[in-house]
A protein has these predicted regions:
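Active-site segments that bind and position negatively charged phosphate/pyrophosphate groups
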Residues: 334-450
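A glycine/threonine-rich phosphate-anchoring loop and its flanking beta-alpha core
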Residues: 244-340
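Glycine-rich beta-strand-to-loop/alpha-helix junction loops that act as flexible
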Residues: 201-203, 233-235, 386-387
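C-terminal charged capping/lid subdomain of soluble metabolic enzymes
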Residues: 23, 33-121, 128-133, 314-317, ...
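ATP/NTP phosphate-donor binding region
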Residues: 4-229, 541-542
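Solvent-exposed alpha-helices and their adjacent loops that cap or buttress functional pockets
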Residues: 136, 163, 222-225, 248-250, ...
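A short, small-residue-rich loop immediately preceding and capping a beta-strand
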Residues: 222-260
Length: 542
């Protein structure tokens, strides 16, 4: 059986299709992918993954499997690799020969860096090798779970991840630590898992390269290894910065994202685009490094201020406008009650709880369908960038919360789409009305600075490989097209006309608690990462 697990082409697209056709659930497919590295795997983790298969294949025997896996995890050999135990058995010579052969045939099977990635490449050359060409590929796996009460002692989500490893190194948002720090400590203590906790303040003003450097130093001091995922517990800023630190540490260290905010829960958390701000620019530095698992637990939403909840909704609206009409309609029907009840986490209404879950699930599904099919941004047909074309240029200077800046970008994008004839005036107003009904910004005085907005457009064009490729609703709500040309003059004219349109909406299009300082955060326009870029003398040779 072990060899069958090892031989499976678990990272191929065909494997996904055949597994689905065979009736295997998502959790089972994920387990099979990791079991490619079965020989190098701690036996505690091995039997934990086999239990996940048993839940799908032999559910009547699940309890027996769970008890046995728990005994193995806590037993004397729970953290020993399977290959180590096999070499101690009666077939030592057989396994020595097998492992020697696998060093050449399938090195991932016995010496993997982690169970979550696989790579391959083909090299061709001419003559004696003075000209060489190669194609390289990497496959990475991830899981996403929307759940509740993950810190309840009865929950085994974190237990199954970290008990086989014997410890957990966790980066925790200081605000989360204040509200849930003791619960985190108690969970790991109850299950006998050593916890090393690194607590960081993670406000927008902290999102610079210095924070990433500090995280890297703490990882070194904690002795983080590439076979143990770091547990990141926090919101969007921590998802971005700690994710970037994991991408840089050992050039690739896995991490699990336990999302405690809306932005982290359905956008920054599962995103492969880790990043930090620098030189006054939003997300200037970054790397592509998706978490191996994202856990969105709306239990944490209860402690969030209304302003933090509100601005997170923008990332859901963006997916609804360009990807999911049904989600858009659900947001219209449910309205601000989502914010008031913390997405159903703080209400006795079964209907609102169910709606909150439906919204989160639909937003997550739409987001990852768009994101994971273009993991390294090798093209710019990216619907999830709606609202993010011009906003990176004015978010920090204006001191706005990210969601409000995105709201302005989405509203302006809907207006541009209308000018292109891609949507009707009714559809334009419907989009703007939804943004406004969630008290998000359609307008901000910073948009009067058309030169600043055009500069943002030029920078994003550089970032997008020479194309503007601004995603906008096209052909109706729930579908997407891309605007690739907009002159300085047309941009300025559109902004002026858009301002007049915004004045017809509540608050003249202004958002409620639109700025960081209004929701208890420092103003990034004052204390943010605005160190000027030192420009060396450049010699131009013609």
């Amino acid at each position: 059986m072990v060899e069958l697990l090892r031989q499976a082409d678990a990272f191929s697209e065909g494997f996904s299709h055949s597994s689905s056709a065979a009736g295997l659930g998502v959790e089972s497919v994920s387990a099979l992918r990791q079991l490619k590295t079965v020989y190098a795997m701690p036996v505690g983790k091995l039997f934990t993954l086999l239990t996940r298969l048993a839940a799908n294949l032999t559910p009547t025997e699940l309890l027996t499997w769970e008890r046995f896996a728990a005994d193995v995890r806590t037993g004397p050999n729970g953290q020993n690799a399977l290959k180590k135990l096999l070499l101690k058995g009666g077939k030592r010579e057989f396994y020595e020969q097998l492992f020697s052969r696998l060093e050449e045939e399938d090195p991932h099977a016995i010496y993997p860096t982690s169970s979550y990635r696989n790579s391959s490449g083909q090299v061709t050359y001419e003559g004696d090798g003075q000209r060489i060409e190669a194609v390289m590929s990497t496959s990475a796996m991830t899981e996403i779970l929307i759940t509740e009460d993950v810190l309840n002692f009865e929950s085994d989500v974190l237990l199954k991840l970290y008990q086989p490893l014997g410890r957990c190194v966790s980066v925790v948002d200081a605000n989360v630590e204040e509200h849930y720090g003791e619960e985190i400590n108690a969970y790991f203590a109850y299950h006998g898992i050593k916890l090393t906790k690194l607590v960081y303040r993670a406000m927008e003003v902290d999102k610079g390269i210095r924070m990433v450097e500090l995280l890297l130093g703490d990882f070194k001091n904690a002795g983080v290894s590439r076979e143990e995922p770091v547990l990141v517990v926090g919101g969007g800023v921590l998802a971005d910065t700690a994710g970037l630190a994991c991408a840089l540490y050992h050039r690739n260290t896995p991490y699990v994202m336990l999302a405690t905010s809306i932005v982290a829960g359905i956008d920054a958390g599962p995103s492969p685009r880790t990043c930090c701000d620098g030189h006054g620019y939003k997300n200037l530095f970054g790397a592509y490094h998706a978490p191996v698992m994202t856990i969105t637990d709306r239990t944490f939403f209860r402690s969030l201020r209304k302003g933090w909840m509100r601005h997170g909704v923008a990332e859901i609206i963006k997916m609804a406008v360009v990807k999911d009409l049904a989600l858009f309609e659900l947001l219209e029907e449910t309205g601000f009650a989502l914010v008031d009840t913390h997405f159903g986490a703080d209400t006795n209404s079964a209907d609102l709880k169910e709606r909150g879950n439906r919204v989160l699930s639909a937003a997550m599904r739409s987001y990852v369908e768009a994101e994971y099919g273009n993991l390294y941004e090798t093209h710019q047909c990216r619907p999830h960038a709606y609202g993010h074309t011009w906003s990176p240029g004015f978010e920090i200077p204006s001191g706005m919360l990210h969601g409000h800046a995105v709201g302005c970008g989405m509203g302006f994008g809907a207006y541009l789409s209308y000018l292109q004839g891609w949507i009707t005036a009714e559809e334009r107003d419907r989009i703007m009305r939804l943004i406004s009904n969630f008290e998000l910004s359609l307008w901000h005085p910073v948009l009067e600075e058309s030169d600043l907005i055009f500069e943002a457009q030029e920078r994003v064009t550089q970032k997008r490989g020479g194309n503007l490729a601004a995603p906008l609703p096209k052909g109706g709500i729930g579908t997407c097209g891309y605007l690739n040309e907009l002159t300085r003059e047309d941009l300025a004219s559109a902004l002026a006309d858009y301002q007049q349109l915004c004045e017809l909406f509540p608050r003249q299009g202004l958002g409620v608690e639109a700025h960081c300082h209004e929701v208890g955060l420092e103003n990034p326009s004052v204390t943010g990462h605005f160190e000027p870029i030192k420009k060396p003398a450049i010699a131009t040779v013609s």
